[in-house]
Amino acid sequence: MASRQVRCNQCGSVLMVPAAAVRVVECRVCHGMNQIRPSTGPWSQPLRPSYNVFGPKRAVLCGIRYHGQDSQQLNGTVNDVKNMNMFLVKYCGFPRESILILTDDMEERDPLKFPTKYNIQMAMRWLIEGSQSGDSLVFHFAGHGAQEPDMSGDELDRSDEVICPVDSREQGNILDDEINATIVRPLPRGAKLHAVIDSCHSGTVLDLAYVWSLSREGYWTWDYQYYRVRRPNKDTSGGVAICISGCHDDQSSKETPALSGGYAFTGAFTYSFIYTMLNEPGLSYGRLLSAMRSIIRGIPNDPYASLFNTDFIFASRQ
């Protein structure tokens, strides 16, 4: 039976429906009811967002709660994005109109700003499109991460790291290979990308070349990824790409209300990143990671704190 793609009129998720008669379909993401009208053909064209702001400072901030998805639901990710947005605008000089925010907050009514797989893919393309020397780009993701079997043979642990969009059960995850191809490889000379990834299994989710890790014992270690396994060229086009992540590829992340005084849930990693940047402007990357680890290890009665690790992942052709 022929099928077509439509978008949920409440949350923007992609739905696969028969191309035949008018019917009502329940969205698996938000459980909203959608009246589906007949199509003149087997497929309808997907919506394309029209982000038309291109400046020297741009950011994509994505926070996903997975509302209604049983045990998958998170509490602090939308707060993480709101905090990161405030930090970039107030303290880093990013124009509000140059920050694209995607959340599944029930107050968000724009279907193109719902964090579906398609919308995240389009947002990443917008982030890098037309970038040039001197540009500062930020990609922040707060949500679920996972690992999938590596089908291309370029992973030492035989697993691809992925981020999970809100419709991942229907549309699948976004692989590290795709993230690298979209926002890392096209990065031009003189441009800089910072990715802050607050999710499980996020250590090498941008597939960058160098991993600089702070061990639990406080030692710094360097690891050059490419010589250990045969990999295609995943370098930038001359720019600098930096990913700061809260987990190794085999670790899980954590939410907690402790860091906000019990007022609201936040991602421990995102909170510690913003707190450190606000209190120690101009610090080195090494000091940033050390300070973040100290903050999280200071969370009272939290078993996650003793396991916390940070990775600084780096790629450059400059």
Predicted features along the sequence, with ranges:
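Cysteine endopeptidase catalytic domains of the caspase/legumain-like
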Residues: 2-318
